[in-house]
């Protein structure tokens, strides 16, 4: 199938939303132990997607109308073949954009190979610009590696760069100005994010939750010259500042209202297809990827998952079990 014919196909759910974006967690392994995501003693046994099977899946999804692939984890750079996966995805007819979301620990050493493979964008998860806070949040002393990776990203004009900064009340909310300052000289988007309502709703027990409205108020108080702009569908608030090259966004996770424009599917490292971040019912793709069913049946499973997408993830999440972000893939 050539690129033009692939573009004629569209995946649509029962509410009329087009699904053209798939996040693939290539591994469940992670080299950090962020306090809001993984326990220090989290199991070391991990799942990892096979390159051949993943390539087959990407080609099939592209033929069904998927245009964007994002590799996640766990930590995707722990997958030994991540540059190859990027190259394969980028070369797949119908796929226009290939990105990764990473904690950045291994990014400096792999960045050249990823760019050469055709990577379009990087979302770097970075919650603090302070080394001591970084070690406290992640339980690992890897700040220097991540800081170097950020410098490299900002010096790579071919990449779309976004910082995902999870706001933790009483821990890093005082760093909002420091993160905003990065947008002055650099064409990146700093995205302040609410904690995700997973892990048995631990966010409420810790008292660290900082809502999107409170983040917006802090920004408005500090920067009265903020100008509202149109951002990505998940960026409920998006702003620019006069004299700044980059932009600022706020992403709700609990107080969200962007379900109506959701275009995503998620594939976990054990080959489960999840239609909604908050609705954890899944469809097992492993038998199909291992050749135990034909392509027609695999397509049926994907369409079934698309049709399972709930209209409102918030309502759906009340009735499903909690999972960690490392399991779901972000």
From Swiss-Prot:
<feature type="compositionally biased region" description="Basic and acidic residues">
    <location>
        <begin position="309"/>
        <end position="318"/>
    </location>
</feature>
<dbReference type="GO" id="GO:0061799">
    <property type="term" value="F:cyclic pyranopterin monophosphate synthase activity"/>
</dbReference>
<protein>
    <recommendedName>
        <fullName>GTP 3',8-cyclase</fullName>
        <ecNumber>4.1.99.22</ecNumber>
    </recommendedName>
</protein>
<keyword id="KW-0547">Nucleotide-binding</keyword>
<dbReference type="GO" id="GO:0046872">
    <property type="term" value="F:metal ion binding"/>
</dbReference>
<comment type="subunit">
    <text>Monomer and homodimer.</text>
</comment>
<dbReference type="InterPro" id="IPR006638">
    <property type="entry name" value="Elp3/MiaA/NifB-like_rSAM"/>
</dbReference>
<feature type="binding site">
    <location>
        <position position="259"/>
    </location>
    <ligand>
        <name>[4Fe-4S] cluster 2</name>
    </ligand>
</feature>
<dbReference type="InterPro" id="IPR000385">
    <property type="entry name" value="MoaA_NifB_PqqE_Fe-S-bd_CS"/>
</dbReference>
<dbReference type="InterPro" id="IPR050105">
    <property type="entry name" value="MoCo_biosynth_MoaA/MoaC"/>
</dbReference>
<feature type="region of interest" description="Disordered">
    <location>
        <begin position="309"/>
        <end position="330"/>
    </location>
</feature>
<dbReference type="Pfam" id="PF04055">
    <property type="entry name" value="Radical_SAM"/>
</dbReference>
<feature type="binding site">
    <location>
        <position position="70"/>
    </location>
    <ligand>
        <name>GTP</name>
    </ligand>
</feature>
<feature type="compositionally biased region" description="Polar residues">
    <location>
        <begin position="319"/>
        <end position="330"/>
    </location>
</feature>
<dbReference type="InterPro" id="IPR013483">
    <property type="entry name" value="MoaA"/>
</dbReference>
<keyword id="KW-0408">Iron</keyword>
<dbReference type="GO" id="GO:0005525">
    <property type="term" value="F:GTP binding"/>
</dbReference>
<feature type="binding site">
    <location>
        <position position="74"/>
    </location>
    <ligand>
        <name>S-adenosyl-L-methionine</name>
    </ligand>
</feature>
<dbReference type="Pfam" id="PF13353">
    <property type="entry name" value="Fer4_12"/>
</dbReference>
<feature type="domain" description="Radical SAM core">
    <location>
        <begin position="14"/>
        <end position="225"/>
    </location>
</feature>
<feature type="binding site">
    <location>
        <position position="276"/>
    </location>
    <ligand>
        <name>[4Fe-4S] cluster 2</name>
    </ligand>
</feature>
<feature type="binding site">
    <location>
        <position position="37"/>
    </location>
    <ligand>
        <name>[4Fe-4S] cluster 1</name>
    </ligand>
</feature>
<dbReference type="InterPro" id="IPR010505">
    <property type="entry name" value="MoaA_twitch"/>
</dbReference>
<feature type="binding site">
    <location>
        <position position="36"/>
    </location>
    <ligand>
        <name>S-adenosyl-L-methionine</name>
    </ligand>
</feature>
<feature type="binding site">
    <location>
        <position position="101"/>
    </location>
    <ligand>
        <name>GTP</name>
    </ligand>
</feature>
<feature type="binding site">
    <location>
        <position position="162"/>
    </location>
    <ligand>
        <name>GTP</name>
    </ligand>
</feature>
<dbReference type="Pfam" id="PF06463">
    <property type="entry name" value="Mob_synth_C"/>
</dbReference>
<feature type="binding site">
    <location>
        <position position="30"/>
    </location>
    <ligand>
        <name>[4Fe-4S] cluster 1</name>
    </ligand>
</feature>
<dbReference type="InterPro" id="IPR013785">
    <property type="entry name" value="Aldolase_TIM"/>
</dbReference>
<keyword id="KW-0456">Lyase</keyword>
<comment type="similarity">
    <text>Belongs to the radical SAM superfamily. MoaA family.</text>
</comment>
<comment type="pathway">
    <text>Cofactor biosynthesis; molybdopterin biosynthesis.</text>
</comment>
<comment type="function">
    <text>Catalyzes the cyclization of GTP to (8S)-3',8-cyclo-7,8-dihydroguanosine 5'-triphosphate.</text>
</comment>
<feature type="binding site">
    <location>
        <position position="23"/>
    </location>
    <ligand>
        <name>GTP</name>
    </ligand>
</feature>
<feature type="binding site">
    <location>
        <position position="262"/>
    </location>
    <ligand>
        <name>[4Fe-4S] cluster 2</name>
    </ligand>
</feature>
<dbReference type="GO" id="GO:0006777">
    <property type="term" value="P:Mo-molybdopterin cofactor biosynthetic process"/>
</dbReference>
<dbReference type="GO" id="GO:1904047">
    <property type="term" value="F:S-adenosyl-L-methionine binding"/>
</dbReference>
<dbReference type="GO" id="GO:0061798">
    <property type="term" value="F:GTP 3',8'-cyclase activity"/>
</dbReference>
<keyword id="KW-0342">GTP-binding</keyword>
<dbReference type="InterPro" id="IPR007197">
    <property type="entry name" value="rSAM"/>
</dbReference>
<feature type="binding site">
    <location>
        <position position="34"/>
    </location>
    <ligand>
        <name>[4Fe-4S] cluster 1</name>
    </ligand>
</feature>
<keyword id="KW-0501">Molybdenum cofactor biosynthesis</keyword>
């Amino acid at each position: 199938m050539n690129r033009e014919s692939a573009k004629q196909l569209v995946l649509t759910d029962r509410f009329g939303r087009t699904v053209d974006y798939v996040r693939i967690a290539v591994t469940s392994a992670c080299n950090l132990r962020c306090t809001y995501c993984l326990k220090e003693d989290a199991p070391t046994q991990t799942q990892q997607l096979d390159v051949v099977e993943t390539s087959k899946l990407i080609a099939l999804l592209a033929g069904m109308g998927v245009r964007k692939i994002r590799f996640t984890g766990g930590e995707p750079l722990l997958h030994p073949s991540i540059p190859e996966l990027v190259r394969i995805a980028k070369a797949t007819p119908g796929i226009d954009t290939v990105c990764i979301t990473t904690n950045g620990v291994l990014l400096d050493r792999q960045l050249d190979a990823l760019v050469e493979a055709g990577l379009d964008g990087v979302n770097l998860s970075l919650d603090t610009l302070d080394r001591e806070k970084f070690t406290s949040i992640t339980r690992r002393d890897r700040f220097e590696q991540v800081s170097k990776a950020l410098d490299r990203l900002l010096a790579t004009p071919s990449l779309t760069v976004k910082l995902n900064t999870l706001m933790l009340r009483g821990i890093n909310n005082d760093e909002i100005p420091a993160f905003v300052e990065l947008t002055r000289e650099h064409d990146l988007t700093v995205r302040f994010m609410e904690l995700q309502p997973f892990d048995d709703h631990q966010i409420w027990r810790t008292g660290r939750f900082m809502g999107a409205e409170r983040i917006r108020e802090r920004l408005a108080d500090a920067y009265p010259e903020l100008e509202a702009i149109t951002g990505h569908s998940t960026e409920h608030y998006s702003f620019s500042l006069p004299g700044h090259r980059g932009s600022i966004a706020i992403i709700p996770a609990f107080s969200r209202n962007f379900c109506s424009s959701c275009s995503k599917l998620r594939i976990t490292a054990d080959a489960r297809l999840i239609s909604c971040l908050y609705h954890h019912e899944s469809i097992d793709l492993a038998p199909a990827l291992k050749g135990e069913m034909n392509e027609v049946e695999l397509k049926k499973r994907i369409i079934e998952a698309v049709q399972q997408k709930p209209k409102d993830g918030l309502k759906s999440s009340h009735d499903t079990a909690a999972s960690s972000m490392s399991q779901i893939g972000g």
